[in-house]
Regions:
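Residues at the starts of beta-strands that form the adenosine-phosphate
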Residues: 9, 32-34, 104, 125, ...
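Rossmann-like NAD(P)(H) cofactor-binding subdomain of soluble oxidoreductases
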Residues: 36, 60-142
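Short phosphate-engaging motifs
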Residues: 42, 87, 113, 159-163, ...
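Active-site-adjacent segment of FAD-dependent monooxygenases/related oxidoreductases
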Residues: 56-63, 154-158
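Nucleotide donor/acceptor-binding cores
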Residues: 8, 77, 149
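NAD(P)+-binding Rossmann beta1-loop-alpha1 motif at the extreme N-terminus of oxidoreductases
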Residues: 2-55
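Internal alpha-helical scaffold of NAD(P)-dependent oxidoreductase catalytic cores
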Residues: 98, 120-125, 138, 142-210
């Protein structure tokens, strides 16, 4: 059973495939979630009609609050950064004024972005996350959730802290088997090693299951 000891509002920066899927589940579970995205049509759709998850895993629409970076106000203790790797530095600089002094940023992304984030907000305010689920942004307010997979969170210095355990509990609203690890770097590097083998699929224009 998920028992959260800290239910502070969650800011999700990047409401595409990764952020949109996680945010929808957290909102449906009753968590206070605010989505931030650069695409104004997507923000408008979420505010007006909610965020829809569809596909083989689940089908639902949930009310959710959203804002563009320029319209965002306030400071948050829990920030999930869900942008593409190449946008990490710019997004972290943009969210930094909205990060509480005792808050943290979780890199819920593909790639190794934790050091970039730590260089901007500080290592003590940076948390790593391994995700491998399948999802796609299909348009304003519309996310396709294709496949569940492992979700792991961990401090970048390997400690199993109370905030990590609480973050794990929060994410269990999305993935019931989410875990906290003292070796988040091992998970991140293993995914990078796996992805390095996928060049062959690109060369022959094949699907992953081929």
């Amino acid at each position: 059973m998920t028992i959260e000891t800290d239910k502070a509002p969650i800011l999700i920066w990047g409401a595409g495939a990764i952020g949109g899927t996680i945010g929808a589940y957290l909102a449906r579970a009753g968590r206070s979630v605010l989505m931030v995205d650069l695409v104004s049509d997507h923000v408008d759709a979420m505010n007006e009609t909610g965020l829809t998850i569809r596909g083989p895993v689940d089908e639902f629409t949930t009310p959710i609050k959203a804002a563009t970076p320029s319209s965002l106000d306030g400071r948050f203790r829990k920030v999930l950064l869900c942008v593409k790797g190449q946008d990490t530095a710019a997004a972290t600089e943009a969210l930094k004024p909205h990060l509480a002094q005792d808050g943290y940023v979780v890199s819920v992304q593909n790639g190794l972005n934790e050091e970039t984030i730590a260089g901007i907000v500080g290592p003590e305010r940076t948390i790593g996350a391994f995700i491998n689920f399948g999802a796609d942004y299909h348009g304003p307010g519309d996310i396709l959730f294709g496949a569940r997979s492992t979700v792991v969170v961990g401090e970048i210095d390997g400690r199993l802290t109370p905030r990590i355990m609480n973050l794990r509990d929060s994410l269990r609203h999305f993935e019931p088997n989410a875990i906290a690890s003292a070796n988040i770097w091992g998970f991140l590097w293993s995914k990078l090693a796996y992805c390095s083998l996928l060049w062959a699929n690109a060369v022959i224009d094949a699907e992953l299951n081929d």
